[in-house]
Amino acid sequence: MATQLDFKELQGLAAEILGIEPDEVQLDKSFQRDLAADSLDLVELIAAVEDKYDVELPEEELEKMKLIGDLWKFLEQKTAERLEA
């Protein structure tokens, strides 16, 4: 995993999976309400994020993630933890 996160990478990944433009993927956007992601889209996105960023998203964390920003904060936290280790 890279030591520095780039939001544009997450935008591109989410846009590719959701079939939307990268600039539509913003921190304040809801996966389901704003980006029209269904449960299959979310499973695919989470699998891709776990692969790309070498993280595991526990189910209890997934249940809290409603916005792109929630996922981004989780990734920032995991990156910070790795840098401290």
Identify the residue ranges that each predicted region occupies.
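Phosphopantetheine-dependent thiolation modules in NRPS/PKS and related acyl-activating systems
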Residues: 2-41, 45-47, 51-85
